Amino acid sequence: MIELFDVDYNLLPDNRSKELFSLRKKTFKDRLDWLVNCENNMEFDEYDNRHATYIFGTYQNHVICSLRFIETKYPNMISDGVFDTYFNDIKLPDGNYVEASRLFIDKARIQALQLHQAPISAMLFLSMINYARNCGYEGIYAIISHPMRIIFQRSGWHISVVKTGCSEKNKNIYLIYMPIDDANRNRLLARINQHATKMG
């Protein structure tokens, strides 16, 4: 059974943090070749701190997907200008929002655990909406790649592109807003239930 849960940075066990940061290195450095900082075969940065909360998706106690949330009132990758060279002036609005970053689904583990038929992206996206709603946020902002945008669109989550930029690889990247309303939540639930019916 796939389980999804959130953990604050301060409560993250050592073994789980090592697993997370190792998987992030595999995804963002080894597979995607992003400009990220790596040390001891792990990827982490200054935003992995007490203001961060992580969503984990696990199967048989193995992490298969994850992302990091940071309230936009605290330093985060978008507001701090990490992506300024890729965009022409981006700024998050004032309000009670949360930024999502370092989102990944581990393809190798999905294959090894024979989960390729499971609606993992929809489950992860639903957990994002549920977390944001439970915490009283107005919505979620993130910067994503073009392939990730396609995954969002296929899931049924009606995200909106706030601004388009160009990465160091000359690929389109997007500042997106993710609404957390009932309609989007229900579409994701329907997609998950549709898969469950097929599997059943």
Swiss-Prot record:
* Keyword terms, alphabetized: Autoinducer synthesis, Quorum sensing, S-adenosyl-L-methionine, Transferase
Under Enzyme Commission nomenclature, its number is 2.3.1.184
One Pfam match: Autoind_synth
Q: Which InterPro entries match?
A: Acyl_CoA_acyltransferase, Autoind_synth_CS, Autoind_synthase
Q: Give the EC class as a word.
A: transferase
Q: Which reaction does it catalyse?
A: a fatty acyl-[ACP] + S-adenosyl-L-methionine = an N-acyl-L-homoserine lactone + S-methyl-5'-thioadenosine + holo-[ACP] + H(+)
Disulphide-bridged cysteine pairs: none
Sequence similarity: Belongs to the autoinducer synthase family.
Q: What functional role does this protein have? A: Required for the synthesis of BHL (N-butanoyl-L-homoserine lactone).
- Give the protein name, as stated in the record: Acyl-homoserine-lactone synthase
